[in-house]
Amino acid sequence: MNIRSIYLAGLFAIIGSHIINTNAQQLRNPFDFPILLSGNFGELRSNHFHSGIDFKTQGVEGKSVHTVQEGYVSRISVSPWGYGNGLYITHPDGTTTVYGHLQKFSKKIANYVKEQQYAQESFNVNLFLTPDLLPVEKNEVVALSGNTGSSGGPHLHF
């Protein structure tokens, strides 16, 4: 390899890493206490691979769950199985964060869910929302942690 090729390869690596770093968003911890894991992504379970990370909630339900970045509530699921009370937030960069096994939603989200449950005459709902319906700010409390759905103890599935 000649010097020019090495120089160009190094230049592209530096520019590429700069672009990646300037586009990376700083995400907030969803809790007001340090994160401890109770489950890892890809961990082998009895009948599946775990598709998220589980955060301990100090052994209790009812801890405030904050949004990690601004965005909008793009999906809400309520079910006695799976995530139980689940919340999906889509962020400006296109990523979606999932919050599962929630005890209850914030008032504005809970009001919307209740309205839809009555309209559909069903406790179980799987709602897909438009960006203008329920926008959220970074650090906003959107729910309380819980143990709903297919959960073996209080935690936040993220």
Predicted regions and their residues:
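Bacterial Sec-dependent N-terminal signal peptides
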Residues: 1-26, 30
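Surface-exposed, glycine-biased beta-strand/turn segments
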Residues: 22-95, 103-108, 122-125, 132, ...
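A cross-family detector of function-defining hotspots
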Residues: 99
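A solvent-exposed, charged loop/short amphipathic helix patch at secondary-structure junctions
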Residues: 113-124
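Histidine-centered catalytic micro-motifs
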Residues: 154-158
